[in-house]
């Protein structure tokens, strides 16, 4: 095998893409299966001059990235299913006020805690239309691992 070829999971691709794009602020709460994004960023982001904050919940995570984005930071948080539900009010605020934020929703297979450590595609509708108000939401999704890098 070519030594330049490396097999990695979608969450790992997301981390590499975010760092490559200049991510300099991450706030998150550990919730599987999105923990695989927070874990490597915890050690790697500070080495690149960025800030990593472990928050008390998903609501605070969303509030933190909104605040950091307002100061000019490139921001991201990662969550899954029920955590994404908790972010909806703050997400709606960010959309209405046009505050740039990247929210990675690593979707679980099945409803809410159906398969908490596996992934699925059931949250696409919530990503697109989950908040209150009448506004447009950009909700890109990756259909294959090699799409994760440009999507992130």
Set out the residue ranges of the language-model regions:
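Conserved thiamine diphosphate
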Residues: 118-152
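Thiamine diphosphate
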Residues: 1-129
